[in-house]
Amino acid sequence: MGRIIGETLQADQQAFISTHSEEIIKGLLEVCPDRIKIVRIKRVGDYNSISVLDNEKFSEIWNDPLLKYSNIMTSLFHKEVMLCESDSDCKMYSVIEHHLKYKVGKYSETLFIHCGGKHRMAKIASALRSLDIDVKLIPDLDVLNDECIFKGIATSFDVDWESIKKDYNIIASNLHSSKEAVDKNKLLGMVSQIVNESENPNLSLKEINTIKAELKTESKWEALKRNGITALPSGDATVAFQKMDQVLRDVGIFIVPVGELECFVKQVGGHGPDWVNKVLETYPDLDDKVYDEIKKFIAQVCCERL
């Protein structure tokens, strides 16, 4: 329909369209992007606020394959958007959000969009915010493991990086371990020593275990994702995270405090979509205590009272 309107409308004609259809907008963008002016109306209580969206921003989005084939245009017709890392995150968080709203007599006006990983979150958030859409973002805790990605996400929400850089560096420095990599020269020297000193043609179990111990790596980041913020070292790192987390929450970035989605319900093993289905099948009653932790988190994200 949008294509038909755009192709038949003459240069000296105008058309005023009231719509909740993303397909009409997409059709118009396909054939006459320069002629479109989108007026978005948001209602809060008894008041309407009106904003005219920037044509240049629409052109940028439409010329970007990543954004063009996402459901960003659907966001125009929702009160707010939640950006998550994966489709399974979206499914579980939306189920909980709908339930919380239903319990207090409200309807959900939130669209959940999965970004296909942390590395795409900043770009999608920036695009949505440029269209005057209310955006919140839910990354896993290990987003802190990559400064470039984390900085991009923070700055896409207009966070002054310098205001949180010190706290971020304190956290990162406390989580990097000397055992995250294996020193090849040290390993070679140790193996050579064991082989040269051994009088037997075969290595003993003790010698094998010594070599295995040297090969073993330890990552505090992995522990952080499995166990959440409780795995942060006590003291400076914990205080720094609390300060930084508050800054992020104030602008709409809610880091998963337990590490990742699956850590909210540890009674069920697995990962991804299968895990979500298994949880909902095993615990069909959303008022079950097993959901208390995730409901508390989503209530904070949505500013709802439990």
Q: Where would I find each of the regions flagged by the language model?
A:
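Switch/communication elements of ASCE P-loop NTPase nucleotide-binding domains
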Residues: M1-N71, D285-D288, D292-E293, A299-L306
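Acidic, Mg2+-coordinating catalytic modules of nucleic-acid enzymes
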Residues: Y69-L83, D87-L306
